[in-house]
Amino acid sequence: MKAEIISVGTELLLGDILNTNAQYLSKKLAELGIFLYRQTVVGDNMDRILQAFDEAFKRSELVITTGGLGPTQDDLTKEAAAKFFSKKLVLHKPTLQAIKDYFKGREEYLTEGNLKQAYIPEGAIVLDNFYGTAPGCIIEDSGKILIILPGPPKEMEPMFETAVMPYLMKLQNCVLYSKVLRVFGMGECLVVEKIKEIIENQDNPTIAPYAKEGEVLLRITARADNKELAEGMIAPIEKQIREKLGEYIYGVGEESLEEIVVNLLRKTGLTISTAESCTGGLVASKIVNVAGVSKVFMEGIIAYSNEAKVKRLGVKKETLSKFGAVSEETAIEMASGIAKSAGTDIGLSITGIAGPTGGTPEKPVGLVYLGLYVNGKTAVKKLQLGGDRNKIRNRAAMFALDFVRRALLPLV
């Protein structure tokens, strides 16, 4: 099946809005094995939308539109679709009621334009919008399929996932199953380079890398007659990827780094405490977000000043004087100090310069040291992180959790 995407909206032509819908739909169609032939952007103009429909259906059986479903006079996608297929626009009473319910208890007022949104091309399959007032619809006519979706991504994406995806899967007569591998400590470019050969040889399953907040997600998607067959197709691809990336893969699906660390602590029967400076308690906060953590996490201290490092963690004044607060030596003493003070098997420390001030040529902004104490043995990790203050702090916290994860893996 060949498909085309028509993005409707003058604001897209003018560059006022980034067309993320087309990117999203392209990836989803690829996952389904539907060949995307062309993407078109057209303004809010009846004749141009009709021309886009005519040209697209000469090339493809499936056309998906986004946008042009709003309450204003220049929102014309449904009107154009009705005219193209010689259909009437008819009132869809369940949609009308849903729109009225949407405005109950809101400061916004129901307008004539909103009522217009309840009219649907006659005979179309209505797609409910649970996040706005503009329903989508599917028109099937003489071997042609037109899927009309709202423009706002927060409305379009859930509609596609819950209604359009199952519809297209049924057309394709297949089950679509995905597995996500979570990677930390390696950038997207390097991840792609490492598994380049696997990606180049992909067909079914497909592999899609995504960078997300300091980590990389690898989505492996298979099409098959049933879930069991799809899982069997994914397994050898996952094995190849794991052989290439090793311990950089920390989890699967929705697992977070902190959940993995807490689970490893439970399996090993070890306890942990944290001593943080530049991250200001972020690591401890992430750990305690995991339910049932009280059996493995004992204590977290924010020792921001040198005085606190000496008084609360037992860092030597001589160490601070000779090497400074941001140093390997201080990080190790912080980790050892918190472990001994809290009586835990593991002590984790972070000290660094989050910026935007405080950096020097010798110790620039973004310099971070992680200290780790595990039953008498110590280790340290040096990081040089980029970005603003919040990004540095968040990335440092994630690297700290990963530092603990890697130390625990051989003990399980």
UniProtKB/Swiss-Prot annotation:
CDD domains: cinA. It comes from the Bacteria. SUPFAM superfamilies: CinA-like, Molybdenum cofactor biosynthesis proteins. NCBIfam families: cinA_nterm (TIGR00200), molyb_syn (TIGR00177), PncC_domain (TIGR00199), PRK00549.1 (NF001813). PANTHER family: NICOTINAMIDE-NUCLEOTIDE AMIDOHYDROLASE PNCC, NMN AMIDOHYDROLASE-LIKE PROTEIN YFAY. Belongs to the CinA family. This is CinA-like protein.
